[in-house]
Amino acid sequence: MDPAPSLGCSLKDVKWSSVAVPLDLLVSTYRLPQIARLDNGECVEGLRENDYLLIHSCRQWTTITAHSLEEGHYVIGPKIEIPVHYAGQFKLLEQDRDIKEPVQYFNSVEEVAKAFPERVYVMEDITFNVKVASGECNEDTEVYNITLCTGDELTLMGQAEILYAKTFKEKSRLNTIFKKIGKLNSISKLGKGKMPCLICMNHRTNESISLPFQCKGRFSTRSPLELQMQEGEHTIRNIVEKTRLPVNVTVPSPPPRNPYDLHFIREGHRYKFVNIQTKTVVVCCVLRNNKILPMHFPLHLTVPKFSLPEHLVKGESWPETLVHHWLGICQEQFDIDEYSRAVRDVKTDWNEECKSPKKGRCSGHNHVPNSLSYARDELTQSFHRLSVCVYGNNLHGNSEVNLHGCRDLGGDWAPFPHDILPYQDSGDSGSDYLFPEASEESAGIPGKSELPYEELWLEEGKPSHQPLTRSLSEKNRCDQFRGSVRSKCATSPLPIPGTLGAAVKSSDTALPPPPVPPKSEAVREECRLLNAPPVPPRSAKPLSTSPSIPPRTVKPARQQTRSPSPTLSYYSSGLHNISVTKTDTNPSESTPVSCYPCNRVKTDSVDLKSPFGSPSAEAVSSRLSWPNHYSGASESQTRSDFLLDPSRSYSYPRQKTPGTPKRNCPAPFDFDGCELLASPTSPVTAEFSSSVSGCPKSASYSLESTDVKSLAAGVTKQSTSCPALPPRAPKLVEEKVASETSPLPLKIDGAEEDPKSGSPDLSEDQYFVKKGMQDIFSASYPFSSPLHLQLAPRSCGDGSPWQPPADLSGLSIEEVSKSLRFIGLSEDVISFFVTEKIDGNLLVQLTEEILSEDFKLSKLQVKKIMQFINGWRPKI
């Protein structure tokens, strides 16, 4: 146990900290390599109590899970993991699917449609053009170009008919003359016919295509690459890149030997390659009497706790020569690259189905029938191969990963005691790429091969269901800690023990997500029906940290309230641009339900300088979360608690809160958070106004229930912070100035009322709510008005018509409808936009394709809207 004293660097002389640190927190907080000591009471196989370790580095390993086979293709041996950069060669055997489904070849799309296999592969480059008619009564035509490349994998989805244009030429002796001068169409009649098509999903382009039956070309139920792989010997990486798992292989020649192999692959053995897995491990060296014992800890399993040198924990300088000395010894006796390429047995003491806390929220073993698991594997293999082919260069078999600083204050790994919360979701989407497999302590999204790529983002915005095992005192301490750092965007649910809080540095280092090919509308439709976003978030960090780039506030996917049109609900739900921070998915963790002292609010206001110049993460994230209160709020929840919830202001539909009176009121809004404390209002009002200022999207659809005291306080607060309705001219100047400096929308309809007036004249600006939609929409005004009144041109107080601002992204749904009327669009188009709940943020993202194909607008209407978005305004 005692290192050799002759080395002059004895580990016994080091003073160790009394605070034990989990390994995942250690590697993300301190730079490696580091010396550590196993904490007392930790039981780790292969380690003794108080063992010294050199924590060498973090590595990202990509391995192929394989089963040993016997002659009859029965699984007989242990499950093993073969690194993707394993140097041995394999030869493909006859596959199980070749026996069940012999290889078929086709010479046209029509032959494919008759057989209708699950998938086909393109055996040659195919180009096909067809002239498609726009409609039965429309003379417009469009040339549809179809291009398929050799090796394209097509999943068959169904059949359909399209209208194609066919020309009937009149017999005339002038045809030759007209043909020479290019005017043959002048004496031709345009006809239409129906052409049967095969709808397929092209996995190379990630788009759906319609292949006419007339299209000729060679297709096969096996990939041409896989057919070419039948001959010769290949590396395991070559096999997984060019074939569809699972595949059966044999070892044709003696494989190379690795001193760290725990499973020996021998000549003549047969294996079934099942799937690909990527995991992050921490490689360590146990230091015993100048003897090095290498070992590793996967970060998706339970990790032990270690004690660190006390000087390191306190942030003081300490002799790093000790680390360099032991690192030199390790490098002499230990080859980490060889160690990373070793073949190992898969541990059987934990179930693969329980790796992800998101899959069933299992706390123990979750047994799934083998037939179901195999069927799921079969269905998702195309996704595995797609990810391997598209991101083939990212198949890291032995790449070092720098996790230092990955736990920033923006909501990523929280230092949970592992005996309290064994299953905890990650808060940083960037860590999903550092940990492609779900880790029960640090990563919450599974990236293992059982899940298709779409499903990685399926539960992005859903509240996590974690076991509530903490005591009440712990919860109170968490709330206090969270409240003290909320202005700095910290979301650590538990106080950091000891002095570790000072050592957790904020950093934006995160691996960029892989590029995602664009998807066609048909595939998006399928994803919409699955309630999964078709395109994952492009940014690993949900919030921009640069002050020059305003964060985009996007709307989460609606779970229960869908638009009548499935095509349009995709846009209004924000699925095409979703970026949900996980820190807000759990209202019990992110939403304060107790009043904080006013000095905390003041601290927030001072730190932010202006609630709009430098918005906090809370100001944005409160718009991104779908509050769990609406899906199951307790009726005993008081109205004051309801008022204090900072995420109660919406521009999208929400569910009716049970047990609350139908009384509507305007939401008070503060334009300068610093002056808010000057007014003699109650702490409840101040807190509520501060929380609403974090959600300045629209007060048109705001609080549904308040009591009279809160309403009166809000009116007083509103009169001190918001200009009254007459006159409106100063209001416009203020908005113009604010819009130039603020990345967040400042147009607040709830602040435009005269706070001292309760006459029905105020109903002119109110949003109309259909009777059938009462449970979805909640108007914030005390009265409801007919559609023709609320959609009428808004008066500014001096009789002039309402004019849209230069920046349209901050408009509410109501103001978008007024903008459309401002440019002269018809009422049916305006009501259509209202029905689809298009606000300014969605309006500026609309394209000509969306407006014409999905919204079914005419070319003139599309042109008007696009020019309006680009800055055009009609002259008055």
Swiss-Prot record:
Cite the InterPro entries for this sequence.
CABIT_dom (IPR025946), GAREM (IPR052281), SAM/pointed_sf (IPR013761)
Where does the SAM domain start and stop, copy by copy?
811-876
Residues bearing Phosphoserine are: 610, 614
User: Which portions of the sequence form the region CABIT?
Assistant: 12-320
Highest taxon listed in the record's lineage? Eukaryota
Tissue specificity, per the record, is: Isoform 1 is ubiquitously expressed.
Gene Ontology CC annotations of this record? plasma membrane
| Changes after translation | On EGF stimulation, phosphorylated on Tyr-105 and Tyr-453.
Q: SUPFAM superfamilies this protein is in?
A: SAM/Pointed domain
Which stretches of sequence are listed as region Disordered?
496-572, 626-664, 738-763
Q: Region annotation Necessary for interaction with GRB2: residue ranges? A: 498-550
According to the UniProt entry, which residues carry Phosphotyrosine?
A: 105, 453
Annotated GO MF terms: proline-rich region binding
Consequence of mutating residue 105 to F?
Does not abolish phosphorylation upon EGF stimulation. Reduces interaction with GRB2. Abolishes phosphorylation, interaction with GRB2 and ERK activation upon EGF stimulation
Keyword Phosphoprotein part of the UniProt annotation: yes
Question: Is this entry keyworded Iron?
Answer: no
Q: Which UniProt keywords apply?
A: Mitogen, Phosphoprotein
Q: Give the stretches traversing the membrane.
A: none
PANTHER family, per database record = GRB2-ASSOCIATED AND REGULATOR OF MAPK PROTEIN 1, GRB2-ASSOCIATED AND REGULATOR OF MAPK PROTEIN FAMILY MEMBER
Q: What is said about its interaction partners and assembly? A: Isoform 1 interacts with EGFR. Isoform 1 interacts (via proline-rich domain and phosphorylated at Tyr-105 and Tyr-453) with GRB2 (via SH3 domains); the interaction occurs upon EGF stimulation. Isoform 1 interacts (phosphorylated at Tyr-453) with PTPN11; the interaction increases MAPK/ERK activity and does not affect the GRB2/SOS complex formation. Isoform 2 does not interact with GRB2.
> Which family is it part of?
Belongs to the GAREM family.
Query: Under what name is this protein listed?
Result: GRB2-associated and regulator of MAPK protein 1
Q: Which organism is it from?
A: Homo sapiens
Q: What is the lineage of its organism?
A: Eukaryota, Metazoa, Chordata, Craniata, Vertebrata
